[in-house]
Amino acid sequence: MSVSNVSLPDPAPARETPADAPRVQPARKTFATYCLVLALVPVIAVTASFFIARSDWYLRHQRNSYLAISDFPFTLRNQRCDVLVFGDSSALTGISPPVITTATGLPTCNIAQPNTALALAGTLALDSYLADNPHPKFLVLQFTAPDFSGPEPHAQLNEEGALQLLRHKPGAATFKLFATHPLETLQFSEYILQTALVDRDWRGATYQRAWQSIQSTHGLLTAPGAGLQNCQSDIEKKEPDPAWISSLRSKYETTGARVLIYVAPYPACDPSHGYYAQRLAELTDNSIERYDIGLFSEKNHFTLEGARKNSLHIADDIARNGFAAAASQTKRDE
């Protein structure tokens, strides 16, 4: 066989080295879109929750009684309330308009708010009422002893206060507050979405029950449950703020009302009574009374019987002040 006739196999194709292979380019556009979506999710959630929170539908279908009645002061228009009650939870559950009206003959309304709402919204509910209704003859302000320390400079963005601001003061200051507390705003948004979409009260029973209660009592809310058997924990000790208390009195005396500032009755079993009795003696229009623990359904909430007892004491003060005012007016007329 001739060497020239031998056929050689074709050479194998050269393999591409990794350096020669076409490089896989990252899908930058897809990645950017993904990041944008991730960034927009909380923005969309917060925006949606704000729209939900501002709707009447939300109040009717969540399960918190305090949120259910939070709009009560803002619904009153041209309402004659010769005695107007404002304050914290101790006033909301502990001052009964029907009892005061029966004892004094004066139409009475209670527009007190939970402590958590006051911490953020302050006197928004009271100021709104005074703008839309005839001014009262008597303005009764009642707070638990620790609340006389005045508003906290850096209050937590809680549900009750944030909801009230969002529904009734949706201006630049409110949205600045949300913007400067992003984590708390997200928590508030999550709460609104959770209570509106997951834990929803389909029949609106909570709203109907709470609303019927405050309409029939002109603002008194009685928390469910029996009276306490013993003190659950000591009430915290906080230094009262005389300047804040004085500013409340001065601000609302300009409305022509007789302003009466009360410290709520104290559980007899709580050892901090002496601390507040001494510090508030010259600042309030009453001395701290001590009530049996059975007249409280929670530390700052009263049973119906406790509210009645407290309201009768306030009615007596109003009657005395009313007679003094009438006598003073008679002398001026003479």
Language model: regions and residue ranges:
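Membrane-embedded segments
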Residues: 86, 90-174
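Acidic-and-aromatic substrate-binding clefts and catalytic sites of carbohydrate-active enzymes
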Residues: 116-120, 237-239, 265-273
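Short extracytoplasmic/periplasmic juxtamembrane "stem" segments immediately C-terminal to an N-terminal membrane anchor
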Residues: 62-80
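Hydrophobic membrane-insertion alpha-helices, especially the h-region
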Residues: 33-53
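Secreted/periplasmic serine-hydrolase-like ester/acetyl group-modifying domain
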Residues: 152-255, 331-334
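C-terminal regions of proteins
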Residues: 271-334
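N-terminal Lys/Arg-rich, disordered targeting/topogenic segments
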Residues: 1-32
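Glycine-rich phosphate-binding "P-loop"
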Residues: 48-62, 232-240
